[in-house]
């Protein structure tokens, strides 16, 4: 299987839902000062190795971060011992911070990956901060036999957001895939290992 993962607020704390905090984080931090969410490196290493431990499952990163952060993100992944893989980022421009449809970039690139590896099932990993659950639901519905599991890191604990994700869990269930709302990487890793 392959893995398609978001980066911001999934692998690394970026404060995407708070634009001011996000801008300050981008401007005032670097690959040495930014920190991954606890347990991310071990979880992604285990996914890459697979159940038997001897696989080399590919990991793709699809993010709405700008291409000018590419070097920082690659160095960050190396420093944190998070498996490397292709990073599909967005072009920088006026639309980047205030785009009404950031999901177009993600959905388009996820489809390209799925169509480039037509016989490979995938695990999708994202967060509840913005639109990852809805984007991944759409992907599961379009490719129902291709997505094994969707892991969503719970970063938005608002009751309305949690209720919306509960609804998405039920929408995905009939496809044979599942959406797992994970409080942390340890929970997701335990679920994946089961």
PLM region descriptions:
Residues 1-103:
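Alpha-helical substrate-recognition element adjacent to the catalytic core
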Residues 65-194:
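C-terminal cap/substrate-recognition subdomain and adjoining C-terminal extension
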